[in-house]
């Protein structure tokens, strides 16, 4: 049952989709119930190509999707100015570099730090680092703010009520279990509300709804992925990272190249996709000794492919048939 407020006069529902199972379930619900809506996808530039192809498939089945992308051109220009003006002093006084070393680092940063048009890469180069568990700025900058600025704010000027649909479920985490199904005047914004229609659904429920409508799951779910947004996500499980190394080494190579670019835009020149403590056996907290070569994403292959705390190579994983479905969710391979 859809909340009746979603059908009120001068109301528009904004259904955010990602190519994942949960956003698909709420999208199907909106279509089933003929909810007045705008469907939107925030392109982060860090999705797998199969997810982008899957989004095209969903659009052919469920209707049009507005695609939005964050733009960091102005902020990158601001950082270039900051580097030119502030780094000559801070690199020497705070990072212990000589004036010659500082000049070399600054020249390299200014050579690299230019907009690429890829939101995720541009964000990380502007920040001089990758997102982390404690600094998860990716979702805010690439999804929340982009949808707010390009979809929500214009909608608030046109409609009395704007309802943001969020495909989150209580089963996912204690934090999400504590969320309400409806939030009035979200972000202290009159007329802006958040609705979570599948909050109490299970994994099985969301897959069953799609199956009932004859809609295929994102193929990444059948290839060992528990998440199908960013490839890889900073929260990727060890087993999931192993699948990525085995199935899509080109994605690892792409991120490794991004590490080189982002590191060049950081003061110490050593920004890595995963923190240097990711592998417990060689965890390093001394930031001054961390290098991209030693702790970049490519260095985690052996760790990802091992069991027993990283001490035993997983021969079964190495020889698995990658054409066979290996979903972590029950029922997906049926």
From Swiss-Prot:
Disulphide bond pairs: none
Coiled coil (residue ranges): none
Keyword list, A-Z: Oxidoreductase
A GO molecular function held by the record: oxidoreductase activity
Residues passing through the membrane, by range: none
CDD domains reported in the protein's UniProt record: PAPS_reductase-like_YbdN
Top-level taxon of origin: Viruses
Family of the protein in this entry: Belongs to the PAPS reductase family.
Name of the protein: Uncharacterized 37.8 kDa protein in gpa 5'region
Organism: Escherichia phage 186
């Amino acid at each position: 049952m859809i909340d009746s407020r979603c059908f009120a006069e001068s109301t528009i529902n904004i259904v955010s989709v990602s190519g994942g199972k949960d956003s698909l379930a709420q999208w199907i619900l909106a279509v089933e119930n003929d909810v007045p809506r705008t469907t939107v996808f925030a392109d982060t530039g860090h999705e797998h190509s199969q997810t982008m192809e899957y989004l095209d498939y969903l659009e052919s089945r469920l209707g049009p999707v507005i695609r939005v992308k964050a733009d960091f051109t102005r902020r990158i220009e601001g950082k270039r100015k900051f580097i030119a003006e502030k780094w000559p002093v801070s690199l020497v006084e705070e990072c212990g570099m000589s004036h010659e070393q500082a000049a070399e680092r600054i020249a390299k940063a200014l050579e690299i730090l230019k907009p690429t048009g890829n939101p995720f890469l541009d964000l990380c180069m502007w920040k001089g680092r990758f997102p982390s568990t404690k600094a998860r700025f990716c979702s805010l900058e690439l999804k929340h703010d982009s949808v707010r600025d390009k979809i929500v704010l214009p909608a608030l000027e046109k409609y009395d009520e704007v309802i943001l649909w969020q495909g989150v479920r209580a089963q996912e985490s204690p934090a999400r279990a504590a969320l309400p199904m409806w939030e009035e005047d979200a972000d202290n914004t009159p007329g802006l509300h958040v609705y979570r229609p599948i909050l109490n659904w299970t994994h099985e429920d969301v897959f069953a709804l799609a199956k009932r409508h004859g809609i295929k799951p994102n193929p990444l779910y059948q290839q060992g992925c528990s998440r199908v947004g960013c490839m890889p996500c900073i929260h990727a499980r060890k087993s999931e990272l192993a699948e990525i190394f085995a199935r899509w080494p080109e994605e690892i190579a792409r991120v490794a190249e991004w590490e080189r670019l982002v590191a060049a835009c950081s003061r110490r020149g050593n920004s890595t996709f995963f923190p240097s403590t990711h592998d417990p056996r060689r965890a390093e907290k001394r930031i001054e000794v961390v290098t991209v070569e030693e702790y970049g994403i490519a260095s985690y292959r052996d760790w990802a492919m091992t069991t027993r705390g990283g001490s035993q190579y997983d021969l079964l994983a190495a020889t698995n048939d990658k054409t066979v479905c290996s979903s972590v969710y029950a029922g997906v391979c049926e």
